[in-house]
Amino acid sequence: MAIILLDTKTINRIAAGEVIERPASVVKELVENAIDAGSSEIEIKIESGGCNLITITDDGGGIEKSDLELAFMRHATSKLSDSELIEIKHLGFRGEALSSIAAVSRIKLSSKANGASEAWSISYEGGEKIGELIPYSLPQGTHIEVRDLFFATPNRLKFLKTERAEIQSIVDIVNNLAMINYSIGFTLTSGSKKPLKYAKQTSLFSRLCEVEEEFQDNSLEINEEEDGVRLTGHICKPTVNRGKSDMIYTFVNGRPIKDNLLVSAIRYAYHDFIPSNRYPFATLHLEIPYDQIDVNVHPNKSEVRFQNKRLIYEIVRRGLIKALSTRTGNSAVSNIDRSRCQGIGKETSGLPFDVSESQGNDNHINNGKSRETKSERELYERRPNPFENRLMKESNSPSVGKKDLSERSVLFDSGIQKSLSQAKTVVLEREQIDLIENHPLGFARCQVYNTYIIAEARGKLIIVDQHAAHERLVYECLKQKSSIKRQKLLLSEVVEIKNQAGMEMVEVYKDKLFEMGFDIQINSENKVIVKEIPAILGTIDVKEMLIDIVDRLMEIEDMLPIEDKVNKILATIACHGSIRAGRTMKLEEMNVLLRQMEETPYSGQCNHGRPTHIEMKLSDIEKLFERR
């Protein structure tokens, strides 16, 4: 077959395939143009998910009459010159959007430039100009109508999703652009449904709370800077998380981007607080010198290349860890509202119109609820053996909680050996009042289902998951100890490791496990002898614990720093070494646990990311009973 030169019409349609993939692509390109034009209000209207009609109206600088036809030519732009290619500051710069949209739709653009006496309109259909420029009634800015998207390339329609899914994709685009451009007002209307409207704001946080209300009461501020790179934004406490990453918003120099490096750094910062299959809520803005970043990677302009990836990763990781290291890590899950008590799921999209079918199987904010494995759940709920019911000793004196965590007791068979025997007397009424009024977790009133502690604090009720709470205490105590005391087993335990990979893990980490309190000797090709275990664990099932540790070692990524690998092993040890659901506790024990939670970092979540406690404000309880 002979080689031929493609005509302009065909070239434009091929190019449009990269730029315009779906209706949301049209919205993205045209709204970005409106932002670059200096608009203060942008209105978007769609019909049939954007396939039948998309209109964008702005009050920006507009386009001169003499430039209207030129604007539809490929690679025609007012935003870029040769000298600016390495310092791109606008959202749009390739000059492909209008020509690509015109190639696959029927488009009409009307605009009135600043200082012009009247507006003018131009139309294209399938890439060809229709008629001449005509006058148009428009006070200021630009109005664009895109009809019958992909009529010229009907095969593309087969690859579109449902109408609701396309609407959701458009909403995601608008949310992203509205988030970072908080000084601009945005309105999105789908058919006759109630509009999604964002008023002009004076700060990113104000806009953030408009888009996702979970940030209102659960936000941690981020502010980090190094070598001319600045990171700002907000993240949510670990107890607010979900099963997919759609609540992670990342921006670079005001441009919404999707970058695995940033997501990886965010997930690393949270890895000690939420399960591996959960994602946090985060909105981060990186300001980077323009000559240190390349945004000209893909026609959709959502990908970038960083000159110094290591620096970017470290700034994000460090900034988030600093925020998560504040005492807010001890906070409870947000208050339980009335709708939750009635079992009504809270929508997370913030949409006035229904897009539920496109949300997948995990529509709702999890607030720390993880998908536990069967073995983890069985371990969590296992009934204690008789030895676990033995009370260990800890003083309930005023000095408790003021010592360094590594010197303090954690409780019971799984804890450091101190006594509760001095706390046998009933707490006096005045002491109860002091605890309720002056301590965040208040005074324990009772235990229900031998699993949850009910405590009264000032103006609120606290419900504590005893296993989850104690697991975090044991874990943090283990992490802070430079050397862990060992206890010799009365009878050494022989443990069979059923696969060769597991035995290799034991050999590789044998010395590190010794530092953690385990004296392990390899007996044969598939058996090891455990002679000593960490004293903090008390009486446990040694075989089950070692097998769990080996399984965990095989799951750990090789690229993780050794400190992270150690912490993951310690988390497994802590899970085995903490009190179980089903363990009966005395009132004195409950209150010691509450005091230690108040003094322990990150006590708001267990090692798997579950909440350790929740709170209900008195005002919310009164609303449940219609007293308010």
Curated annotation (Swiss-Prot):
Entry similarity comment: Belongs to the DNA mismatch repair MutL/HexB family.
InterPro entries: DNA_mismatch_repair_CS, DNA_mismatch_repair_MutL, DNA_mismatch_S5_2-like, HATPase_C_sf, MutL/Mlh/PMS, MutL/Mlh/Pms-like, MutL_C, MutL_C_dimsub
Any one GO BP annotation for this protein: mismatch repair
Annotated Gene3D superfamilies: 3.30.230.10, Histidine kinase-like ATPase, C-terminal domain (3.30.565.10), MutL, C-terminal domain, dimerisation subdomain (3.30.1540.20), MutL, C-terminal domain, regulatory subdomain (3.30.1370.100)
Signal peptide residues on this chain, from the entry's feature table: none
Function, as annotated: This protein is involved in the repair of mismatches in DNA. It is required for dam-dependent methyl-directed DNA mismatch repair. May act as a 'molecular matchmaker', a protein that promotes the formation of a stable complex between two or more DNA-binding proteins in an ATP-dependent manner without itself being part of a final effector complex.
Protein name per Swiss-Prot or TrEMBL: DNA mismatch repair protein MutL
Pfam families: DNA_mis_repair (PF01119), HATPase_c_3 (PF13589), MutL_C (PF08676)
GO molecular function, one term: ATP binding
Region (Disordered): 350-402
